[in-house]
Design a protein with these regions (language model features):
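Short, amphipathic alpha-helical interface elements at domain boundaries
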Residues: 1-94, 201-219
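An acidic intrinsically disordered interaction segment
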Residues: 1-6, 120-132
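Short, well-structured alpha-helical interface segments that form or flank functional binding sites
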Residues: 32-36, 98, 102, 156
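Short, structured motif recognition centered on aromatic/hydrophobic residues
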Residues: 38-41, 107, 158-163
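Short, Lys/Arg-rich nucleic-acid/phosphate-binding segment
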Residues: 52-54, 117-121
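Short, amphipathic alpha-helical interaction segments positioned at domain boundaries
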Residues: 61-88, 99, 125-160, 165-168
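Ordered, amphipathic secondary-structure segments that act as subunit-interaction surfaces
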Residues: 79-116
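Short hydrophobic helical membrane-anchoring segments positioned at the boundary
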Residues: 143-219
Length: 219
């Protein structure tokens, strides 16, 4: 299977058949999109995270052009994870819309999604994953969890974000979810998996902030 970036694969698995984030957890799912973009930058050593502050340390590579707007935002100055999530989730919505469009257009260019009109008045562009793309990607992730050996940083980031935003349960059985939970616990105890363990902690920090923001918006 031709793999894509973490944020592209997260989008494919998170949106529903109409090209929208699930209505019951739209805020968490959209915030997960931002977290996935940060993970792509982190995995490519474009940013570093220290004391929950994200700092750009080098130029973005061409293959991550679909998160150029996120990179430009972070390059302005170091941002805390809290500030990042608030700016993307609870300001005008312009940043999130721009990021979503970038992802959708990048997937459209490789025929991974189709572009259609959506919204109440049909004036919104939505990007719908091609049939079978979800299933193929889920099989890859399921195999990564169940087989022996280390899970790649890419797959670990994707799995963690899907899990923390409650978008994994629809694809994994209860026993498979338990297997992933066990793998995560083992990883955190393994001194040879320090980088992966740190990445899992970053995702957990981000999703904890996501939930706080969501609860604040509800109240």
């Amino acid at each position: 299977m031709n793999r894509k970036s973490v944020i592209q694969e997260y989008y494919i698995l998170a949106v529903n058949e109409k090209g929208y984030m699930p209505s019951m957890r739209a805020d968490e799912s959209n915030a997960g999109l931002v977290a996935a973009g940060v993970m792509d930058l982190l995995l490519n050593e474009v940013v570093m995270i220290e004391r929950k502050k994200i700092t750009v340390v080098k130029e973005i590579p061409g293959e991550l052009g679909h998160i150029a707007s996120l990179y430009a935002y972070l390059k302005e100055k170091p941002r805390t994870i809290d500030k990042l999530m608030n700016d993307y989730m609870f300001s005008t919505g312009k940043r999130l819309k721009e990021l979503t469009t970038e992802i959708g257009e990048s997937l459209l260019s490789v025929h991974a999604v189709t572009e259609e009109k959506g919204g109440l008045f049909g004036n919104k562009i939505v990007y719908i994953p091609e049939p079978g793309s979800k299933e193929r990607l889920v099989e890859v992730l399921r195999s990564a969890v169940l087989k022996e050996g280390r899970i790649t940083p890419h797959d670990m980031a994707l799995l963690c974000i899907l899990k923390e935003t409650k978008n994994l349960n629809q694809y994994f059985s209860k026993s498979e979810g338990a297997d992933l939970k066990t793998r995560l616990k083992e990883l955190k105890k393994d001194p040879q998996s320090k980088q992966l363990a740190e990445m899992v902690n970053y995702v957990e920090d981000m999703t904890a902030i996501i939930m706080c923001c969501v609860m604040t918006s509800i109240n």
